[in-house]
């Protein structure tokens, strides 16, 4: 038989064992202030977390043009791991796919800034009165074209399909060098503006003056030929009149001689 002393120790140990067993069976207590970290990111989806505390629930939102795939969920919840006592979000199952109802919408076209390039080109003389691109220093977002003697405006490329656009540019003028400015916007009409040097303009004026003088000389020569030709038919008529006037005078003189002879 056990001694009374051993029995006393056994009775005192029972409450301790019961307390240890109760602590093992009870769940771990959550530490105050425990929060979840930021949730993981999902492709084509966004989330705005309002509360990071345990047991809070949040939802993902698919971006514009996408929608939630069937069988997936946008809901996540902040829970705590009982083994490690660490809070975390539940694994999201959301998948965002492109919305087929928006497939027929075309994307917004991007705006392309026109580019202005300049390259030298040898001037070509012409008999026509040329046109010029009037230069404006420090001018932006405007394009002005004026007609002036000594310059020329010629189209360089055909109009491409689409709308025409005009870009802002600054034009400069060199007195002795012909410059060609080409406007090249994406889907627009491009113009080549050629400036002729003063030497070429002077040659053009000389050629025009020479042509005018030649035409005037031809007109004068034609008038003289017509005048000479018109004067030629009048001479036979005058000879015939003079002959007719001399014949009666001869007849009268002969008749007088006959009368004198008869007497």
From Swiss-Prot:
Job of this protein: High-affinity receptor for interleukin-15. Can signal both in cis and trans where IL15R from one subset of cells presents IL15 to neighboring IL2RG-expressing cells. In neutrophils, binds and activates kinase SYK in response to IL15 stimulation. In neutrophils, required for IL15-induced phagocytosis in a SYK-dependent manner.
Keywords: Disulfide bond, Glycoprotein, Membrane, Nucleus, Phosphoprotein, Receptor, Secreted, Signal, Sushi, Transmembrane, Transmembrane helix
Keyword Secreted on entry: yes
GO process terms (BP): cell surface receptor signaling pathway via JAK-STAT; natural killer cell differentiation; negative regulation of neuron projection development; positive regulation of natural killer cell differentiation; positive regulation of phagocytosis; response to nutrient levels
A GO MF term: interleukin-15 receptor activity
Amino acid composition bias (Low complexity), ranges on this chain: 113-135, 154-169
Residue positions the entry lists as glycosylated: 51
Stretches of the chain found on the membrane's Extracellular side: 33-205
Keyword Lyase on entry: no
Expression (tissue specificity): Widely expressed.
Pfam families: Sushi
Matches recorded under InterPro entries: IL15RA, Sushi/SCR/CCP_sf, Sushi_SCR_CCP_dom
Signal peptide (from-to): 1-32
Protein name per its UniProtKB record: Interleukin-15 receptor subunit alpha
Location in or out of the cell: Membrane; Nucleus membrane; Cell surface
Stretch list, region Disordered: 113-178
Compositional bias ranges of the Polar residues kind: 136-145
Sushi domain sequence ranges: 34-98
Membrane topology: Single-pass type I membrane protein
Cystine pairings recorded for this chain: 36-78, 62-96
Domain of life per record: Eukaryota
GO cellular component: cell surface; cytoplasmic vesicle; cytosol; extracellular region; nuclear membrane; plasma membrane
Segments on the Cytoplasmic side according to the record's topology features: 227-263
